[in-house]
Swiss-Prot record:
Gene designation per UniProt: proA
InterPro entries assigned: Ald_DH/histidinol_DH (IPR016161), Ald_DH_C (IPR016163), Ald_DH_N (IPR016162), Aldehyde_DH_dom (IPR015590), G-glutamylP_reductase_CS (IPR020593), Glu-5-SA_DH (IPR012134), GPR_dom (IPR000965)
Keywords: Amino-acid biosynthesis, Cytoplasm, NADP, Oxidoreductase, Proline biosynthesis
Pathway, per record: Amino-acid biosynthesis; L-proline biosynthesis; L-glutamate 5-semialdehyde from L-glutamate: step 2/2
Name recorded for this polypeptide: Gamma-glutamyl phosphate reductase
Highest classification ranks of the organism: Bacteria, Bacillati, Bacillota, Bacilli, Bacillales
GO BP term (any one): L-proline biosynthetic process
Entry-linked HAMAP family: ProA
Length: 413
């Protein structure tokens, strides 16, 4: 029997036990995980360094290495994320709606776990803990399939969490790492309907497309982030420049970083914006007018408008109207996060009404599209689809509903 089937069976059994636990029992287990992560930071960093060395030897890009790397501070942040999940209200068992029918039947819709969640993700070890903590809080067992580039880090994190669970009421089998990272085993996982209730892919476009196209299990699709900021002609100079710098440079390798800035031609501070970005080391790829005007600006190619750079590279486009900006976003956006910087309420309302994305911003950075920033605690992913969940997915996104019907002998006539 393969590793996949053995672990999937254990997860299915663990899920039924996990669903019966109280909020207090789940919270106690999560608190133990947070403590264990801090206590075992040295071991975790030692294993992460193995992945980093192999990644450098294999020529991983700086953005992928950044996602892969763990530091003492990042492990602390991961543990803090688990503690935040402890503090969040438990959605399991909550009554969503209750009503009585004319025949006396009382119906109550409640929130329940999904069962077994399958996570498929790339070189981001923090996802291992984020996903596990959210799943355990909501009574779900979780099968984690990370990338081969993070295998030592993921094995260390799972080992630390499972050791912590031994002191709790949560079965250690409730979190499992699929150590076989081969494509063939991944394809089998995508079709394991008998054991897995939902798949959640987190990663690049290739990974997400592979899961969506090959899975027979329902998929909660997370999307790539080709995010835009539109600077309207009324935008305040300092605000616009600060927001663009933050959205591009605070952490360029993440999906909520801005990739294209669209600027109204009548905005008077284009020169200052471009010079500031250039001084901060951003490679600028813009339309011909800007490339001809500024020697440090490269002319953009068609594919640049559709690229999630995940690096200090920014596409810049000039437009004459808010309509033109919206049309550009409609053509190239990935329905993730889009922003408008403007003092014109009419333009903001138009932008909010017409742009189709999970999260829209007015006068704020796209970097806030994040479960923790939204107050959800650690997120399971950012959904760009429209069914079941959209935007940063917190606890409620990995639950489903059950309707309880209370009768007194009613039969249907």
């Amino acid at each position: 029997m393969s590793e996949l089937i053995v672990k999937a069976k254990k997860l299915k059994q663990a899920a039924s036990q996990l669903a019966m636990l109280s909020t207090e029992e789940k919270n106690n287990a999560l608190a133990m995980i947070a403590e264990a992560l801090i206590a075992q930071t040295g071991y975790i960093l030692q294993e992460n360094e193995k992945d980093m060395e192999i990644g450098k030897e294999n020529g991983l890009s700086p953005s992928l290495l950044d996602r892969l790397q763990l530091t003492e501070e990042r492990v602390q942040q991961i543990a803090d994320g688990v503690r935040q999940v402890v503090d969040l209200p438990d959605p399991i068992g909550e009554t969503i709606e209750q009503w009585t029918r004319p025949n006396g039947l009382i119906l109550k819709q409640i929130r329940v776990p999904l069962g077994v969640v399958g996570m498929v993700y790339e070189a981001r070890p923090n996802v291992t803990v984020d996903a596990a903590s959210l799943c355990l809080k909501t009574g779900n067992a979780v099968l984690l399939r990370g990338s081969s580039s993070a295998i030592h880090s993921n094995k260390a994190l799972i080992s630390v969490m499972q050791q912590a669970l031994k002191q709790s009421k949560i079965p250690t089998d409730a979190i499992q790492l699929l150590e076989d990272t081969s494509r063939e085993t991944a394809q089998q996982m995508f079709r394991l309907k008998e054991y897995i209730d939902v798949l959640i892919p987190r990663g690049g476009a290739g990974l997400i497309q592979s899961v969506v196209e090959n899975a027979t299990i329902p998929v909660l699709e997370t999307g790539v982030g080709n995010c835009h900021i539109f600077i309207d002609d009324s935008a305040q100079k300092e605000m616009a420049i600060d927001i663009v710098i933050n959205a591009k440079l605070q952490r360029p390798s993440v999906c909520n970083a801005v990739e294209t800035v669209i600027v109204h031609k009548q905005w008077p501070y284009i020169k200052e914006l471009l010079e500031t970005l250039h001084e901060k080391g951003v490679e600028l790829r813009a339309d011909k007018q800007l490339a001809d005007t500024y020697p440090f600006v490269h002319e953009a190619k068609e594919e640049d408008w559709a690229t999630e750079f995940l690096a200090p590279i920014l596409a810049v486009k000039l437009v004459e109207t808010v309509d033109e900006a919206i049309e550009h976003i409609e053509r190239y956006g990935t329905k993730h996060s889009e922003a408008i910087i403007s003092e014109c309420n009419e333009h903001v309302e138009q932008f909010f009404a017409r742009v189709d994305a999970a999260v829209l911003y007015h006068n704020a950075s796209t970097r806030f599209t994040d479960g923790e920033q939204f107050g959800y605690g650690a997120e399971i992913g950012i959904s760009t689809q429209k069914l079941h969940a959209r935007g940063p997915m917190g606890l409620r996104a990995i639950t489903t509903t059950k309707t309880l019907v209370y009768g007194s002998g009613q039969v249907r006539k």
